Amino acid sequence: MSSLAAGKPADIEANKKLVREFYEMAFNQHKPTEAAKKYIGSKYIQHNPHVPNGSEAFYSYFEKHFKENPKAHVEIKRVLGDGDLVVLHLLSKENEKDRGRAIVDIFRVENGKIVEHWDVIQEVPEKSANTNTMF
């Protein structure tokens, strides 16, 4: 597990930029292979139970996903950085009729590459017990 020690502001901003660019290329441009080769390190630890470790497993999984869901899109709501960690809070939809999922993705960056990933995914419900949004 990574340290949450404070990093240099310039490093944190560079990590946030790197993760945002990776996400845009992989999930909105639907280029997971290109994104993985450009932004993921040679050792990639995956904590999502549906995706194996390694960059090849990542892009194989998402190439198939985008063939099945060609209108899939994400909207990044927040980007937070802490040391070598970058956190994205986003809305993910498979198509324009989908209510979507609220996702929190956590990435660990090392030497300018993404080397580890965690996520938490929650369906956006049809009805809510309150008037707040998930974002």
What are these regions (language model features)?
Residues 1-135:
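C-terminal and inter-domain tail/linker signature
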